[in-house]
Amino acid sequence: MNYFDLSFLKYLQDNNSLPVEEAVRRFGKTLSTLKRTMKELNELLPENVHLYQDNQFITTRIGYSEYRQFLQRVQFNRYITTAEERVKDLFVALCLHDVVNKNEYYKKFYVSAGTVKNDNPVMMQLIQGHDLVLQSIPRKGSRLTGDEFQLRVAVCMSILKTVEIGADHLLIAHQANEPINRSIAEQFLRECSPEIKQAAAYYENVISPVITLGYNGRKYLLVYLSLALHRIRRGHWIKESTAAQFLTTFSYDVLPDAHENACLNLLIASLTFTHRPFTLYDARLVLYVKRTCCDLEGYPGITIHNKDAWFTEIYNFIYAAIIQNKFHLWFDDKKLHDVRRRYPEWWAYVQHAVKEIEDNWQTSFSAIHLATLVLIIKKYELKNRVVSDPKKRVIIVTNSSESKVGYFKEVLFSRFHIDIPACININEIAQLQHLDFDLLITFTNKISSHLRYAGLNYVKVNFWLTQEDFRLLREQRMW
């Protein structure tokens, strides 16, 4: 069993049923390969949730609970690990221990002796990407050395998806961990147990009274803080923090060391907030972000009405993005992959607008950050379209009571950018001569004939508006 088998089961657990043709196309496997995968999985699944082919569908009744139980049954003696998985697990172990004997450590993966050597290129690529060094200690094993802050940040990214936040901000294992992630979570939670409690207390008593972090930001902070406290206990302090001084940060004074606090403050500033007081003022960056905002506002069709909110959101995003890109503090997000194709002009415009900031802070924004910035701007474009575009003036001609028409009006308001200056009875159509309007709406045939007889243009729709009615109204340039 390997990672593909688990991915296949996870997809079926999410969707219950999958057409055979789609499965072959989605996973790039032949039907015979998929059948072998199903057979392998069924050996560890209860019979009532077996995978089976039903005509042209692959189906199962497995739920999340059965899926979690299945993963607990998958041990390394039945799971073929990849080099990337083994290296990620070892990378965490090298952070949690001063020296690790790789040959001994790899025995848990049930692989051949030569696998350790074969995995070396993958390990070198990982550590060199974070400016770290794997030092050989004769007759003992290997030691991970290099910039202490970079080391912690890199290892946090390997741990993050394996844990969740439990009660009282305490980290616990993710319930549906695959074998490698389960191994990583177990060693982290075991080795850092006292520090996890200490980190939760620091967050509750020192940090949360000042800011409110979103779930993912809070989880990252708790992982980093637990790891930092564990490393500090073993004598691995951050001895130099000049690399963390490229932006002004708010000081939380969590740890008893200036260098440690400087790096922790920077890390917190990069995270996702649900409530962020304006504590991240960097005078130099403010000037550059103002220029960036002006560039973005110059794009045709954009009018920003609430410039304070606009600047604050762009500033906070760029501030965090600089830190995240410098230290690789972000994950890929498939939902953002299509942004460049959908909005190519905006993509190019955003790239140009942030170029000056990238150059001056010696970083390069990832595609994920560029896509996010495009969506922030599109959000303001949609918001401000409601402010900028004149509302369509609609008058409803009806003999119905106000209470009944009130519902109809609210449905229209929820779907269209309109104003309804009046609702008039058919017997009052003479008033239309004195009213300014763009469109008349009615929902009865009787009133339609009266309006037609009076030579007035109108649209007749159903009181219970249908999709066809919405289409008809959009044809009247209601948006």
Where are the regions a protein language model picked out?
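A cross-family "folded-core" feature that marks the main globular domain of proteins
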Residues: 2-479
